[in-house]
């Protein structure tokens, strides 16, 4: 035993080589959030996520998942086609034929029951007499046109049925008409969620953002004395809001502010910390948006760093790890590594795939800005490596960075360096500069002394 020696560096390095880096597919699978997102989404909202995954997962499994997802809806023709694909059959069971007939009959029934009130609500002379007072509106329609509560409720039932059939545009209109007249707060809240989903599924982003505000207001007022109900409903709203968040540019600022607000950041930290991925992606890509003021962006970045630091034990992925490496640990090598992994995760995420290039671009800017702040002389080759670029690409990148950010710096092409003309350093920067080289040695010495105090 006494003759044993620690393993050599060569042994350790050869051992590391036996565990090669994960492939992009392995990274994407490891950080796939679909199982966490599904419980907070309506089944119709889950469908586009499954569609997106069909290019990444086993096609047969995706088809089966679609069937299980939609078999209880009234999208009878589509569900029947999925059944035929799963069972490799040209024929469908009688139950599908029967259900289709029932759905068509029900649609006809709802159309007849709601015909009078829908016609009235399309009559400009009638609509002109409606006011913000729902009770007065109902009284007017009842006295002047014979409208009943049952007719109003038929709009709700018809809208829900159209939604179940996949007729989202019709559903949105019917639920809107119901909401204008109904005084049933529970049904109005349900109709608002239904209209929100319908606007998402028809990609009507401006209308969807109007529903975000209505749902938010409903949560605050209807559930003001029900903290658990508020937590659950806020969690749903956060997840549903991901659709306009990354598909409608004007939504970005509104939803970033909403997610950072005390009630919603608390919801994220308590109930769904994986949403930090989307918040981090939004904040980092916000850097590229020309209208974004520096002070607002710095505030968002500061808030993001704080939350990522707090929640690191609860949730992390390459996107949040990138933030931690760069702004908490000041580890540029780790930040560059995590940026590479983050790119794989972003390209495999339904909500973030379109932001991938913008994220990588912004992240490289953040790495280079942070690196330049704490170094006086920068080796172009070294910085290029940290940005994941070759030397020529890195040189062009740095030239553009100096031009775009107007930093006081000059490039020494002969030496392959950038000379930063920093203003007098803050205490914060001086501490980083002085400790970055000594930190590792200090920690090792302290560790050795703790283990071997008498040596």
Swiss-Prot record:
Q: Which GO terms describe its molecular function?
A: translation initiation factor activity
User: What does the UniProt entry say about where the protein is found?
Assistant: Cytoplasm
Cite the entry's keywords alphabetically: Cytoplasm, Initiation factor, Protein biosynthesis
Please name the GO terms of the biological process aspect recorded for this protein, alphabetically. formation of cytoplasmic translation initiation complex
Tell me any Pfam family this protein matches. EIF3E_C
What range(s) does the PCI domain occupy? 256-425
- Disulfide bonds listed in the record: none
Asked whether the UniProt record includes Oxidoreductase among its keywords, one would answer no
Question: One GO term of the cellular component aspect?
Answer: eukaryotic 48S preinitiation complex
Q: How does it assemble?
A: Component of the eukaryotic translation initiation factor 3 (eIF-3) complex.
Family per record: Belongs to the eIF-3 subunit E family.
Functional summary from the UniProt entry: Component of the eukaryotic translation initiation factor 3 (eIF-3) complex, which is involved in protein synthesis of a specialized repertoire of mRNAs and, together with other initiation factors, stimulates binding of mRNA and methionyl-tRNAi to the 40S ribosome. The eIF-3 complex specifically targets and initiates translation of a subset of mRNAs involved in cell proliferation.
Give the protein's recorded name: Eukaryotic translation initiation factor 3 subunit E
Gene field: int6
């Amino acid at each position: 035993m006494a003759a044993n020696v620690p393993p050599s560096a060569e042994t350790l390095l050869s051992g590391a080589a036996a565990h090669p880096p994960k492939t992009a597919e392995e990274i994407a699978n490891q950080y796939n959030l679909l199982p966490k997102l599904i419980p907070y989404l309506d089944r119709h909202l889950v469908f586009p996520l499954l569609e997106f995954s069909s290019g990444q997962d086993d096609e047969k499994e995706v088809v089966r998942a679609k069937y299980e997802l939609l078999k209880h809806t009234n999208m009878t023709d589509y569900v029947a086609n999925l059944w035929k694909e799963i069972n490799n059959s040209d024929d469908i069971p009688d139950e599908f034929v029967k259900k289709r007939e029932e759905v068509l009959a029900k649609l006809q029934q709802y159309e007849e029951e709601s015909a009078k009130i829908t016609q009235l609500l399309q009559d400009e002379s009638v609509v002109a007499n409606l006011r913000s007072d729902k009770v007065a509106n109902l009284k007017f329609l009842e006295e002047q046109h014979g409208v009943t509560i049952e007719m109003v409720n038929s709009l709700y039932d018809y809208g829900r049925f159209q939604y179940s059939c996949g007729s989202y545009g019709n559903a949105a209109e019917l639920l809107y008409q119901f909401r204008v007249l109904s005084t049933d707060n529970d049904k109005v809240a349900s109709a608002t969620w239904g209209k929100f989903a319908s606007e998402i599924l028809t990609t009507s982003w401006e209308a969807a953002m109007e529903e975000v505000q209505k749902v938010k207001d409903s949560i605050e007022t209807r559930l003001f004395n029900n903290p658990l109900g508020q937590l659950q409903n806020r969690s749903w709203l956060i997840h549903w809001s991901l659709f306009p968040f990354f598909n409608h540019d004007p939504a970005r600022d509104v939803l970033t502010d909403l997610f950072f607000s005390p009630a919603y950041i608390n919801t994220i930290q308590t109930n769904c910390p994986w949403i930090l991925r989307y918040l981090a992606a939004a904040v980092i890509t916000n850097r590229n948006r020309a209208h974004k003021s520096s002070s607002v962006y710095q505030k968002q970045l500061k808030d993001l760093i704080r939350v990522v630091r707090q929640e690191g034990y609860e949730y992390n992925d390459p996107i949040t790890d990138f933030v931690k490496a760069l702004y908490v640990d000041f580890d540029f090598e780790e930040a560059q590594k995590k940026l590479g992994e983050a790119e794989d995760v972003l390209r495999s995420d339904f909500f973030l795939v379109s932001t991938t290039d913008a994220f990588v671009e912004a992240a490289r800017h953040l790495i280079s800005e942070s690196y330049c702040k704490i170094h006086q002389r920068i080796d172009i080759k070294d910085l290029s490596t940290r940005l994941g670029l070759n030397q020529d690409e890195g040189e062009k990148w740095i030239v553009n960075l100096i031009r775009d950010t107007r930093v006081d710096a000059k490039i020494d092409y002969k030496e392959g360096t950038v000379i930063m003309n920093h203003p007098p350093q803050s205490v914060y920067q001086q501490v980083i500069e002085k400790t970055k080289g000594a930190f590792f040695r200090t920690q090792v010495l302290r560790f050795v002394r703790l283990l071997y105090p008498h040596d």
